Structures are given as C-alpha cells and as structure tokens.
Amino acid sequence: MRFLPVGDSMTIGATGDFTWRYRMWQHFDTFPGLRYEIVGPRTTLYDTGANAPVSHAYADPSFPPAARRHLSGWGEGWLHMAPVIADAVREAEADVLLVSLGLIDLGFYTDAEQTAANARAFITAARTANPRLRMVLLPVIPNVRAVTDAPFAASCARFNDLLAKAVADLDEPSSPLLLASRPTAYDIRTDTYDGTHPGPTGEHKLAAAFADAMHQAWELGGPYAGLPAPALPLPA
C-alpha cells in the first residue's frame, strides 16, 4: 500500500523538525505484516533562512530517504494542491492520501466556502488518477491567530463543517473518504513551537489522528502507540 502525505507547513516541517510524517513512518514500521511505501515527489524540509524547501536536516538523520517523500509545501493549501494532485497520484501510484490542508487557505487565500470548493476539486482530480484511491482528511486545527481573531476562528469552524459535508457527499465504496478526528487534547500552547507548527507532542498527535482513523475504519495497521504520556501535575 502506497501512502502519499499531502499538506502545508505543518506537514513539510522546517529545518530541525522530526515532522508528523516521521512519526507516521515509525508507526507503520511497527507492523511487520503491513506492506507499505511512503511516496511523493518531494523529500525536503523548509529552510526558513533560505525561504525555500531546500533542507535535508531532519531531527533524526536516520529517517530513511525513501520514507521522507511527500507532497507538501510551506504556504500551500487546497488552492495549490488541487491542480497538481492528479499528476502526483498518477506518478507515485498512490493508494492512500493523508491530507492536512486548509489553515493556509483560510488565513491568506480563500474563505470557508471557496476553500471547501477547492477541497472538492482536489478529491475529484485525485480520483481521475486512481478511481480506487482512499483519502484520510484532517480537519483544520485553528492556530494562535484564532485566539484573538474571532472571524478567522469562525471561518475555521465553518470550513470544518463544510469539509465534513464534502466527505459525506463524495464518499464512495470504491474510493472511501475518512474524516479524521481532531487530535485528542491538542493544545497549541504545548503541542506547537510557535502557535501553529507542531512540536514533538503535536507531531505524535497528528500521526495518531491519521493512524487511528485508518485502523478504526479499515482495520489497517493498529492503534497509534507512540503518544507521549501526559505530564504529571506538579505537587501541591
């Protein structure tokens, strides 16, 4: 089974990150009976100094080059991925898409309705390359901007409602769609390093959202076992 991660800056990661893609590879690798490959046209991280996706400096240098493959980009959203997803699926011969998109769209490019329309266009285009393609879609996780920007927070909530409707409308037995649950107890104060981009605990929680959705719906792999233990309360 060939998995293609698709996303924005939360998925590509930056220099020195592990990324949730790394956590997903670790998860897949715990199941000897799961024949899998991670595919995609890109392998790099984003270098904020160079302002370009040119870094190979993952936090764990032993992350296998073949497992680093993805289709994600800093500042890229549904708007950018919808026109290129068919070629990416076709060239990679992908079977499953793991998609985390929408925050960038809502923050900079499109409103909730336009973003949902682009998500639908993405799904339709991807299926032209593989009519039996499976997709797991992660809802938007509002970032720190939503704390003080009520219209933006409302736009994120509205888009998530529209994404759920798109999944219900477009789901097909031959090409199933899964809407993953928002990661359990995800807290931008502790699970990100800047209010948006996941740190180690956030990476685990994003990977768990995808892994648990696939296990529960498709009996693929198993429950995610890599979540860090919750911090113990300080003594009184």
What is each PLM-predicted segment?
Residues L4-V6, D191-A236:
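Histidine-centered active-site loop/cap adjacent to the catalytic His
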Residues L98-G107, I123-R158, P183-Y186:
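Active-site segments of SGNH/GDSL-like serine hydrolases
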Residues P142-S181, P200-H204:
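Substrate-gating cap/lid alpha-helix
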Residues S9-G13, R42-T48, L103-F108, I141-A146, ...:
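Solvent-exposed loop/turn segments at secondary-structure junctions
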Residues F31-T43, R134-L138, L179-S181, L220-G226:
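Surface-exposed patches in mature extracellular/periplasmic domains of secreted proteins
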Residues T11, T15, W25, D29-G33, ...:
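Sec-exported extracytoplasmic/periplasmic mature domains
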Residues P83, G107-F122, V147-F159, T192-T201:
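Active-site cleft segment of glycoside hydrolase catalytic domains centered on the general acid/base Glu
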Residues L4, M10-A117:
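Conserved SGNH/GDSL esterase-like catalytic core that processes O-acyl groups on lipids
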